[in-house]
Amino acid sequence: MAHPFDNFDYARYDIVIDYPQYRFYPTPYSISDGLRISRIALSSTETRVEFEFTNTVFDRFNVKRGTYIKASGTNKLEFKRAENVAVAPYMSTFEKSGEILKFALIFPAIPPKTKSFLIAEQDKKGWKFKGIKIR
């Protein structure tokens, strides 16, 4: 079955990176273990981060408000919108184990010369992707 991102037009982005390198730090509870970054798209107006979440045990998933990106020497930039995933307190639900949810978080643009950045769901308790390489 086709997914909306399969036909997404990335022409407006200056840089598109599939499956970038990063270090992942899941939450203390195992719900985030199936989470990975599948694509990053950068433009002068926004940073688009696409994820894939593979459901293993739990039957629902969401993204917390306040999830942010941060490049070295910059302030935190919280996401502006989410595509194809529920934002807390709402939940995206699954029919079965092994089901994959593809979603995107859209953030403000990061500085053009940024070499790497991090994404964090929350400062202390949430999942984190660090050292996401873009150059």
PLM regions and their residue ranges:
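Conserved functional micro-motifs across diverse proteins
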Residues: 1-135
